[in-house]
Amino acid sequence: MDIEDVIAEVLQRIVPTKEEENFVSTLMEEIKEKTEETIEELNLDAKPYFVGSLAKDTYLAGDHDVDLFIAFPLDTSLEELREKGLELGKVLGERLGKYEIAYAEHPYVRAEYKGIRVDIVPCYNVKNWKDVRTAVDRSILHTHWVLENIKGKNNEVRLLKRFLKGINAYGSEIYIRGFSGYLAEILIIEFGSFLNVLEKSDFMLRKKIIDPEDWMKRESEITMKTIKREVGEDKPLIVIDPVDPRRNVAANLSWERYGLFYFKSQEFLKEPSTEFFFPRKKIGNYLSALRSRKTHLITLTFNPPKLVDDILLPQVERTAKGIKRQLELEGFKVLGYDYGREFIFLEVDRLEREGIKVKRGPLYFTQHGKRFYEKNDIVWIEGKELASEKPISTFIVDVLEEILRKGQFSAGKNIKDAIVKGDILVDFVPKELSKDAYLFLSREKFRVK
């Protein structure tokens, strides 16, 4: 198939039908009506806004999650915004059908209406970037900017989103670190089409900075501060937010996810296929992968605290890195790690280490040498210095249990206790983690060849 045929076939699968558009339109109208009624009943000074892909008409067929933001006046205190926002969310959630409380920067309500998820999020009714108080406030400005600038390129955005999903590079959440929907929209608006964005994959990386609203001219000092910060943190791409010069829209984008986009873009342009958009599921056996690699898999399973992914998973990542570092200090080579809400994977070169630990000591004719001699059971001389040895645990599970028991590892503050109380598995994972284990061991997560 040539590239035009591939794109035509993909568009048939990702562009909402007229019936679907009517369903979404009716759904949003009903939710808006119920929201306005609830605001009036509670006598609140607030205004509802739809944000996200549904509001911008860049959603993919079948993807109907609703983002409903309740905007309060700027003179509302943060405490009052949280309190009234949550109160409204609960009443509206009850009216829509069912709901639960979720937690991010502040609590919000996640409801369900006609089988569709509806996030009800309180925010400030900002008019420009100088009014922004909380992380979610910009969302209303983002929606306005995209609607003003997209100019009929909605399907180009859909193509880019589906491509990014297909190559496993979509989602700006901290545990994914890929392209956000808003970033995809900006790139289409900036470069004009899906194919142009792919063709610019190398150019973007070298140019590094994209500034759609010329903030460098309008607010040069603030924008340069943003650029210096992001360059200092070695970000692969800097996209100055069209609505706020203080923010890099690509701040969460990792080098690994951009690398997937970089290689897959070139591959698609060379050999176009619908496979990039709708890949076949990678099926494999983690035990076979272990046998072929001649390595070992250590799995820590635990019961996580009730936190949203954006808060929990960075803590799990920090813990995984801390345990990896400690195991390496204990003499084990850790070839890689991965993690999720309830697990940490560590691939190691061996399960046992040497049974003794040799410690180099001070000069034998010093006071330190005398204390070293008295403190240790087995001591010998190497030149002018003393050395000693002591027996140590050899099996990695014993070593790991000691590390956990003594708390000798860096960990997220909310998760350390859960890790310590969890289980340690060797070369085996529960059935529900077998796919994750295979993707980890096969390196499929970031594999480009």
From Swiss-Prot:
Gene3D superfamilies in UniProt: Archaeal tRNA CCA-adding enzyme catalytic domain, Beta Polymerase, domain 2, CCA tRNA nucleotidyltransferase, domain 2, Poly(A) polymerase predicted RNA binding domain
GO MF term list: ATP binding; CCA tRNA nucleotidyltransferase activity; magnesium ion binding; tRNA binding
Keywords: ATP-binding, Magnesium, Metal-binding, Nucleotide-binding, Nucleotidyltransferase, RNA repair, RNA-binding, Transferase, tRNA processing
Reaction catalyzed: a tRNA precursor + 2 CTP + ATP = a tRNA with a 3' CCA end + 3 diphosphate; a tRNA with a 3' CCA end + 2 CTP + ATP = a tRNA with a 3' CCACCA end + 3 diphosphate
Cysteine-cysteine disulfides: none
Binding site for Mg(2+): 65, 67, 119
Biological process, per Gene Ontology: RNA repair; tRNA 3'-terminal CCA addition
Function: Catalyzes the addition and repair of the essential 3'-terminal CCA sequence in tRNAs without using a nucleic acid template. Adds these three nucleotides in the order of C, C, and A to the tRNA nucleotide-73, using CTP and ATP as substrates and producing inorganic pyrophosphate. tRNA 3'-terminal CCA addition is required both for tRNA processing and repair. Also involved in tRNA surveillance by mediating tandem CCA addition to generate a CCACCA at the 3' terminus of unstable tRNAs. While stable tRNAs receive only 3'-terminal CCA, unstable tRNAs are marked with CCACCA and rapidly degraded.
Subunit structure: Homodimer.
HAMAP family membership: CCA_arch (MF_01264)
Family: Belongs to the tRNA nucleotidyltransferase/poly(A) polymerase family. Archaeal CCA-adding enzyme subfamily.
Name the record gives this protein: CCA-adding enzyme
